[in-house]
Amino acid sequence: ASDAPYTSSLGSVSISGVSLEWSAYLGTPDTFTGSFECSDEDLTQWWYDGVYTVDMGTDVFLANETEPRSASSPTLEGKQVLFDGAKRDRDPYVGDLAVASLTSYLSHDFAKSSRSVLEDLAQHQRSDGWIPPASINNYGLPLFDYPLWWVVCSVDLVMYTGNTSYANTYWNTLKKALDGYYAANTDSATGLLYKNDTGYGDYAFLPRSGPVTYYNALYVHALSYASQLATSLGLNDDAERWSSRASSVGKALLSHNFDQSVGAFYDGGPCPGAAAGTYCNVHSQDGNSIAILAGVTNDTTSAQILDYWQNATSQGYGNAFYDSSILSPGDQFNSRVYAFISYFEIAARFATPGQASSAFDELRRLYGWMASHDPQITMWEGIGPSGAPYEGAFTSMAHGWSTGVVPLLTGYVLGVKPQSPGFKTWRICPVVDGGGLAWAKGEVPTPQGKIEVSWERDNVQTGVIFTLNIETPDGSSGVVCVPTLGLDNPTISMDGAAVNVSSDPTSGWASVDAAGGKHVFTVEA
């Protein structure tokens, strides 16, 4: 060739140095305001792996680095946001925040990335009250459930961070979603939400229509949670209206959608090609789990649902999100596991008396599988048949919605949850049975300072078989649930003095009111 003196098929390149620009949130020891540790090293590691997964997805929204399907948005440009995944899709979806934001609040107390997303979506609310799920498709992706997740995540933001100014600013947005959009999509004959079209409408892009259990259970949850916040803010009319509606929808859901033959809720819509108004013989993890957490079912029915689900869907890598693939046979729904929705099932197990062992079992199967397979330190978007990434190489392997292990361990094993904005009131109800744990300790950030909790099982020979230490901010108050450990009449002491409390053998706890400050609780046989 004419350029032969100047080119060659062989050669070498010398590199004198390599550097990496880390643009995501850099979690270092000094940025952690929350923590978790327990006697099971795996659980401890998974808590921090979950935080790292969310750190990787926390970044500045830039037009040339985000989802290419018309997701670039000048109202988000340059803001800290919480993306759904570190590499894919690189767009902040509000449903993902239902888990990912909790992980962020409980680890670094970093709310800016979540607030940016929630505020931006509120500002794009449609005139009928619908709120877009993300900026993708020019804020036009037609998901039916995500306005409810906006409500839930907005309440989370206020409860965990104390940002009541956000609530005041966007209260009418919240009301318009609950009282406008969803009220207009309610079947007056049944009192249930009814999705008319069969196009995709939720987090998994499922072809569901009709009085779908998941949509209605999530509606009950959103109404109840918004009512709780309204009460804290002194908005009693809103609180009463939403609480009443939540109760009515919950009763209608039990009346119309519960399948007595298996002891679980139907998915709620027709089978493919079947007539509208019929119920397909299929059941889903999302609706059943959230119905339990929303208080639709009593403890007996909740346990019945959870026992069925364990028997019908258990895999070595978690529990599948459907008990059948009839809605889309080629997609093998009965072998697909979403850690996102599994969060709600595991939470339902922790919240249901007698189900703690199954909660720890599912937690260990799910997160143990991801931790023992490449990349080992981040949580996957979804798991498919045989435990492989559910969309092959296209699967996001660092997805914030899959980090439920963080709020599960903090919210149930430590037992710390806010009851009013900014943890001004709180509950500390640790689940100490079922997981084989000898001790656990950790910290939870609040606007007034940290809540510190540690508990341990003691040597039975000393007479004291359990000790719980808490320290909460001055001026706060709450309820402490002291585990009775199966004892019929234990001696429970608070700060060295016996307290006269009645224990509930069903829940396995004795409830004690406590003011802020340091307290030590002991249980003696």
Regions found by a protein language model. Give the residues of each.
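Substrate-binding groove/exosite segments of carbohydrate-active enzymes
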Residues: A1, S12-Y181, Q285-N288, R336-F340, ...
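Surface-exposed interaction regions enriched in Ser/Thr/Asp/Glu
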Residues: S2-E21, G517-A525
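Structural helix-adjacent loops and short alpha-helical linkers that scaffold large soluble proteins
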Residues: A4-G11, E41-L43, Y105-E119, Q125, ...
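Extracytoplasmic low-complexity repetitive segments enriched in small/polar residues
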Residues: A4-P5, G17-A24, F32, F36-C38, ...
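Catalytic cores of carbohydrate-active enzymes
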Residues: N64-L82, A86-G95, V99, P132, ...
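Short, hydrophobic/amphipathic alpha-helical patches that form generic packing surfaces
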Residues: L102-S107, A291-G295, P407-G411
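Non-catalytic C-terminal accessory modules of carbohydrate-active enzymes
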Residues: A356-A525
